[in-house]
């Protein structure tokens, strides 16, 4: 997020964003890793694919989540390509990294932040499922409140006085589509070579909703 600094240079903004992300991750007691790719200039490179492959193998990730391939933000779309490429080779021993190959290809899921349209405004494939997140919205709010620099950026860049309010409204809009207060949306990656077992859907069955 180094390009998104308001009143701070790129290096200082990177430090701020990194610390904000670390604090947000700590709410979930999760590890945070930054691969130091430059904000706004992200490219799908061998180096980044291998870095993601290393992390997947280090944590023996069974489930991987990333952006949509038709996300509104170009960096997000590139991230999706990198993550997909790294995930599909998780079991291949010839990938030139030190971590041993995994026994099974992780499940891959995509999610969307605010809208169900592509970069030119066309409707995208409807979500495969929604998850009722009302019971964890307080946790989401706690995590988001650490991202103060993002709120500041949106006030200047998009004239949004309450960016986090827009995020919460997006959850409410998704919830309205399936009859709950707040929801998140997900798509399972069903391309060739990927596992297609609905593990997340089964594990969260109590909270999964469909928009029929």
Residue map of PLM features:
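ATP-dependent adenylation/pyrophosphate-handling site
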Residues: 1-12
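A generic structural signal for short
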Residues: 9-10, 40-41, 156
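Residues that cap or flank secondary-structure elements
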Residues: 12-13, 44
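Short, surface-exposed alpha-helical segments at coil->helix boundaries
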Residues: 14-22, 80
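Glycine/small-residue-rich loop that forms an oxyanion/phosphate-binding "nest" at active or ligand-binding sites
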Residues: 17, 41-43
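Short, conserved catalytic or adaptor-binding loops enriched in Gly and charged residues
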Residues: 23-27, 100-103
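A conserved beta-strand->alpha-helix junction
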Residues: 25-40
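Metal-dependent de-N-acetylase/amidase catalytic core
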Residues: 43-212
């Amino acid at each position: 997020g180094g390009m998104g600094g308001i009143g701070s240079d790129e290096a200082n903004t990177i430090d701020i964003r990194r610390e904000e992300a670390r604090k947000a991750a700590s709410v979930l007691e999760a590890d945070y890793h930054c691969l130091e790719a430059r904000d706004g200039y992200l490219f799908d490179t061998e180096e980044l694919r291998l870095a993601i492959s290393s992390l997947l193998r280090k944590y023996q990730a069974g489930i991987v989540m990333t952006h949509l391939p038709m996300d509104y933000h170009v960096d997000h779309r590139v991230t999706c390509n990198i993550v997909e490429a790294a995930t599909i080779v998780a079991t291949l021993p010839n990938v030139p990294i030190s971590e041993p190959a995994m026994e099974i290809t992780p499940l891959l899921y995509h999610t969307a932040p605010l809208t169900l349209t592509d970069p030119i405004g066309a409707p995208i494939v409807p979500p495969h499922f929604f998850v009722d997140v009302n019971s964890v919205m307080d946790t989401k709010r706690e995590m988001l409140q650490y991202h103060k620099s993002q709120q500041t950026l949106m006030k200047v860049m998009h004239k949004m006085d309450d960016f986090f309010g827009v995020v919460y409204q997006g959850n409410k809009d998704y919830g309205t589509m399936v009859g709950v207060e707040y929801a998140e949306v997900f798509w399972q990656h069903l391309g060739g070579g990927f596992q297609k077992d609905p593990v997340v859907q089964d594990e969260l069955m109590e909270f999964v909703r469909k928009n029929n």
